[in-house]
Amino acid sequence: MNQPQPYMDQHAPAPPPASNMTQYSNYGAPQPLQPATHGYGAPTYPQYGQYGQSMPPMQAGHPVSAPMQGQMVNSLPLPTMSAPQQSGGTQQFQQSFDTTGQIAPHGMKPRVTATLWEDEGSLCFQVEANGVCVARREDNHMINGTKLLNVAGMTRGRRDGILKSEKTRHVVKIGPMHLKGVWIPFDRALDFANKEKITELLYPLFVHNIGALLYHPTNQARQSIGNATMAARRPESSQEYMRTPQGTQAPALTHHHSMSNPINASMPPQPHSIAPHPASGRPQLDRAHTFPTPPASASSMPMTNGNMPNSYEYGSAGAVNSASTPPSNSQGMPQYQTSQPPYTQSYSTPGSYSQPQYTHQQPGVQRFGNIHSSPDGVKTEMGPPARAGAENDHPDHKVGGYGGQQDAEGEHEGEYTHTSASYGARRLSYNYKPNPAPGPLHQDSSHVSPEMTHSPHQNGSGRATPRTTNPYTGYNNTPQRQNQLPSSNLNYVMSSDARAGAPNGQEYAQQAYQPAPQYPAMNGIKRGREDDDQVDPYGRPSSALGEHKRQRTDPGAMSARPISQPHSIKAGGAVRR
């Protein structure tokens, strides 16, 4: 009874029949005819009987009258002559059957999504109806006619016939499923929707300002297409623009706040371009990229190590510059010297040749020489201190006193074992041994080649066998050799292997096959030989026994030889077993 109340007020002269005859107020009947309308009011009710539960004439207090009157007013499509009085009814009629698609149906919420059509370079608004997604382009407002007619439940043949007859159409055969089909102009799509009575189902599709209805969970107050398209096209880039100033300026303040002013004033752009996001969980990248920055000012190098340890490897060199060293470094460096006094005393003598050894390998690091003599020099994160750590593992090997000649031996003994052709000029320093080796495993004279001392067959070949590459102990004259396993500290001094503290068996095996990479080692004991078919460069006659022994103990060498070429026995003689 709430809906037709304004119409009852307009026809107030006959209140009792007005409650029953309100559905006829839309006809604009004159006032004298209202008593007569009560006569034929009863026979007209049966056609609306499907809406009610009983057939008797309706009265004001009947419970069925309210839904009946509401439905009858909504279902009467007849035009009226009294336009001023029927303004409310005509507005309700236009809302229920809207042909423009601009007015939302009663109780329907607009649901629009937007995607970027990369192939066409346009934003597409999508509306779903009857399980079909109908898309509309933002640039030219064309609508996918194939999906539009699918919403109406049209057959494929009829749909294709209608779309083929369109003059302006754009056929899309690739891309997502909801974008494939025949695209037609906006007005033609609206005509098809009105003919098929699906305009209300596709309500937000034909709204002119459809971008304002774009569904966004966090911001539903958007009122312009520009904002909607910008949010849809750049959902992440806009956030990056917002957080980029926070990510670029912050590292310049936090990463370099401990440095002196010359570096901060001269190098501000470098942290901006290299470390845009300090909170990304990878701070080591910042330090690695800004690694060359601290040497620009020598006075600022210790500052980086004092506040940010291990951020710059140059910071550990602050101990050399005693004048500019802060308390953190000055307290840290003597701590190494006093914590283990026996090591520092034993290292005082060999420090004279350990520093030239670093000069050979890395000429630019001479200023770090004083640090490397400390037993904990490995923790300075520099390249050379790995060798210092290796020296610490065998401190008592060096007390016996080494000459400069043994330093040269350590340089070249790895080369002699494998690249024998390049060792011709250095052979004198290798063979020169005035004293017999006191090692427990070698009772022979040290002037004999090591391969003859370690091999069960006393052959005179100048090649090293897999048995001889393991313990190179025949040319050491340290008095401590009797109490230890055969190992040489020369390898630890001159080698560039970071695993210098490994046992001597593994250490020598690693050096054994490094110069010959084309024959990878199988177990760490065997090694590939690249000089099988070469004549001895030292001019010594090779024994037949040694050659046959290599054929049996090294299957890799057998596979390396050509099968068609027989391997002749050098220096003649029958093979003895």
Curated annotation (Swiss-Prot):
Regions recorded as binding DNA: 145-166
Region described as Disordered: 1-41, 228-487, 518-577
GO cellular component: nucleus
Biased composition (Polar residues): 19-28, 238-251, 319-333, 351-364
Low complexity composition-biased segments: 334-350, 465-479
Positions with biased composition (Basic and acidic residues): 390-399
Keywords, in A-Z order: Conidiation, DNA-binding, Nucleus, Sporulation, Transcription, Transcription regulation
A molecular function (GO) term: sequence-specific DNA binding
Chain intervals for the UniProt region annotation (Nuclear localization domain): 526-552
Localization of this protein: Nucleus
InterPro entries per UniProt: EFG1/Phd1/StuA, HTH_APSES_sf, KilA/APSES_HTH, Tscrpt_reg_HTH_APSES-type
GO process terms (BP): conidium formation; positive regulation of transcription by RNA polymerase II; sporulation resulting in formation of a cellular spore
Highest taxon, organism lineage: Eukaryota
Domain called HTH APSES-type: residue spans: 111-217
Regulation: induction: Expression is positively regulated by veA.
Main location: nucleus
Family membership noted in the UniProt record: Belongs to the EFG1/PHD1/stuA family.
Main function: Transcription factor that regulates asexual reproduction. Binds the StuA-response elements (StRE) with the consensus sequence 5'-(A/T)CGCG(T/A)N(A/C)-3' at the promoters of target genes.
Protein name according to UniProt: Cell pattern formation-associated protein stuA
Native organism: Dothistroma septosporum (strain NZE10 / CBS 128990)
Gene: stuA
